[in-house]
């Protein structure tokens, strides 16, 4: 800010008014007590700043502020000279401030033109600053836009992951439910298969090629059952009480009946050729039977009447009711088939009392047979093959990956309420009643002589069916029961005595197990 020039001031016109006023003020001898040149003439001194500000500054400038005067000096390039004594901690006694400029010299007023005011390029600085700031703002906006795009991308990815997570959780829940249902189905299948295995274990299932009794051919192995029951009779009194009155008319299964031999009936599934059996009797008894395969059963010839065993037989019981060893399954199955009234003749085989092997019979005699219904080998084999094929197909379907199961149908099919033990089996009381009916006498007993003289002796019919029956466990049967006195005591003793010689008869040797073992046929499974 230029001040008006004081009195006595003169200078070129291009010199700033502040410099002109300063030159006049320093050169005025009236103000030497407050401001004057230095002895060298290169600078000037301000002796008392307070008094100078009050008395001198208002005369030349429009203010009395010492700080403003110093700021103007600095704007024109004047610098404050600092002495050594002024740089200490102790305040100097004299208030003296010295300012100097290279072009402000005593006696050289023309140099004032060289003193220029410092021009501050405010506009340039502002434009550069604004440019820098604009670049920074642009870069910042670019970064913000990039960050915003990344944030939107992350939001979209997060939303997609959220949807995928929800879908995965729904799939996991569905898979868990399907897994639980499949576990239930598998458990039902396992229970069903276990029940089948248990039922097959209880049933007396035979091999594919069981034995048929033949006359003179090579002996076959005995039929194999799930449980082996001995067919030997017990000599002497048994552990069971006396039979009920329903058994009084027959000596079959009587504990005190003494016999050594008799016809043996065994069910077979294949008819093997054998030599015909001749007998001195008449023709074969032709009675109506169901359409079933026939099985040949060897019949012993009548023995001479002077046998001591025949004479020692009980006179109260006819010889036609002599005990005959039968298979328990054959007997019970044949009884259960008797739901319809069918004429069944009582078995009246003759007893071989000679204690010797039977004499050879003439080959020209007519063949005598007993008709027994039995399963055919091919039917049984086809049935077993079909069961194996069904089990293999079931296993293949369960192990395949693309197999879908209707759980509702399977759960209804394999419910625990439908098991093998729930099958409708014949009641024990009705079975026992049928046994008593069968064992009751069908006709009045005839004397021994009339039985021997009858031409139809030894031609009785036995009705048999191959229906499977669940056998009872001998250990679970009460020993004191008198309903079935012989079914579970067959294995306690030998049917034939040790003194009898039946080594030549293959049929009796098969029942006693005295025949030497033979080489196993490789075709027999």
Swiss-Prot record:
SUPFAM superfamilies, sorted: Winged helix' DNA-binding domain
Pfam families membership: HSF_DNA-bind (PF00447), Vert_HS_TF (PF06546)
Signal peptide (from-to): none
N-acetylmethionine modified-residue sites: 1
Subunit structure: Monomer; cytoplasmic latent and transcriptionally inactive monomeric form in unstressed cells. Homotrimer; in response to stress, such as heat shock, homotrimerizes and translocates into the nucleus, binds to heat shock element (HSE) sequences in promoter of heat shock protein (HSP) genes and acquires transcriptional ability. Interacts (via monomeric form) with FKBP4; this interaction occurs in unstressed cells.
Function: Functions as a stress-inducible and DNA-binding transcription factor that plays a central role in the transcriptional activation of the heat shock response (HSR), leading to the expression of a large class of molecular chaperones, heat shock proteins (HSPs), that protect cells from cellular insult damage. In unstressed cells, is present in a HSP90-containing multichaperone complex that maintains it in a non-DNA-binding inactivated monomeric form.
Protein name: Heat shock factor protein 1
Organism: Bos taurus (Bovine)
The gene coding this protein: HSF1
